[in-house]
């Protein structure tokens, strides 16, 4: 049975904001991130925010996908931020070192301000 995850994409000032709600695990990670890659399309000069406010759990495969998306963004002169992490999710991301690689801020508004500067 597939675990529930919802990802809503919105755009603001040319920035792709992906809002996550639910849990990312083995049952839904491939499908979820395939949809994100498709929605981003060409990574050239793209600006992305992953708003993790509603994300309650993520597994190692999901972390790999997040790192891979960041790598694609960076290689193509784009920028990416993570925002609004739940404490448990933030602890996991810090533990594996993602927060030392991908800029992480408290709010979407902070990420937008950084991406506009």
Feature-to-residue mapping (PLM):
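Acidic phosphotransfer microenvironment of two-component signaling modules
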Residues: 87, 109-110
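Short acidic-hydrophobic, aromatic-tinged amphipathic segments that line or gate anion-handling sites
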Residues: 103-107
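STAS-typified acidic loop motif
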Residues: 3-35, 52
């Amino acid at each position: 049975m597939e675990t529930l995850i919802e990802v809503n994409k919105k755009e603001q000032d040319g920035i792709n904001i992906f809002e996550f709600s639910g849990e990312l695990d083995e049952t839904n990670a491939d499908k979820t991130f395939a949809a994100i890659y498709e929605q981003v399309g060409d990574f050239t000069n793209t600006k992305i925010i992953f708003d993790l406010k509603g994300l309650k759990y993520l597994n190692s495969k999901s972390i790999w996908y997040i790192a891979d998306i960041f790598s694609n963004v960076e290689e193509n002169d784009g920028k990416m931020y993570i925002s609004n992490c739940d404490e448990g999710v933030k602890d996991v991301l810090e533990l594996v070192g993602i927060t030392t690689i991908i800029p992480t801020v408290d709010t979407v508004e902070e990420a937008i301000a950084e991406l506009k500067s």
